[in-house]
Regions:
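Short, low-complexity N-terminal intrinsically disordered segments enriched in polar/charged residues
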Residues: 2-5, 18-64, 174-179
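A solvent-exposed, acidic/Ser-Thr-rich amphipathic alpha-helical stretch
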Residues: 38-41, 55-109
Length: 179
């Protein structure tokens, strides 16, 4: 449980818990309720984090008791999420992802995404999916429901060619790529 302010404490900063104002920040702005702009920012921040392929960093965006459905796998808790992501990125090599907001309301965001990767035999895939996200008041994701389909592609059919890491600003979106 996060600490709360008492009447003798200094005034709160935008109802942010005390813990979130130190260097171990538990706040993950933007915070709900979302607007079109903040939902888009949240999706881009998630995309950027996933493109690092750093399981520990990505897992910090989720509550400690976050619940996931990823394809047919059900996960509970940040440790399980981190272990899942480590397995995922050992298998999905040269992973590059683009996310795009589909809808949002209050503390929920729905995104569609596509990512490209290859296996250890050099077979390329484009994975298409949808995610439904629900956030707590501190901007941590407490629920992630993901449906994903893998499409084998030829290496020459790839659309994501930026260097590994963050998708460059100005790179076409999913819609602009016709995906």
């Amino acid at each position: 449980m996060l600490p709360t302010l008492t009447s003798s404490d200094p005034a709160p900063q935008d109802d942010v818990p005390l813990l979130s104002r130190d260097k171990t920040s538990m706040n993950r702005p933007p915070l709900p309720p979302f607007t079109a702009q903040t939902a888009s920012e949240k999706a881009r921040l998630a995309e950027d984090a996933w493109n690092t392929r750093d399981p520990a960093r990505v897992a910090l965006a989720y509550t400690t008791d976050s619940r996931w459905r990823n394809r047919a796998e059900f996960l509970h808790g940040r440790e399980a999420i981190e272990a899942f992501l480590a397995r995922k990125w050992r298998r999905e090599l040269d992973y590059r992802l683009i996310k795009e907001v589909w809808a949002f309301h209050d503390s929920r965001i729905a995104v569609r995404f596509a990512y490209e990767w290859h296996d250890d035999s050099g077979n390329w895939f484009r994975s298409y999916g949808n995610e439904n996200w629900e956030f707590d008041q501190y901007g941590l994701m407490r629920l992630r429901l993901a449906s994903i389909n893998d499409l084998p592609i030829k290496e020459g059919d790839r659309k994501y060619h930026w260097p590994l890491g963050r998708r460059p600003d100005g790179h076409p979106s999913l819609s602009e790529l016709g995906l």
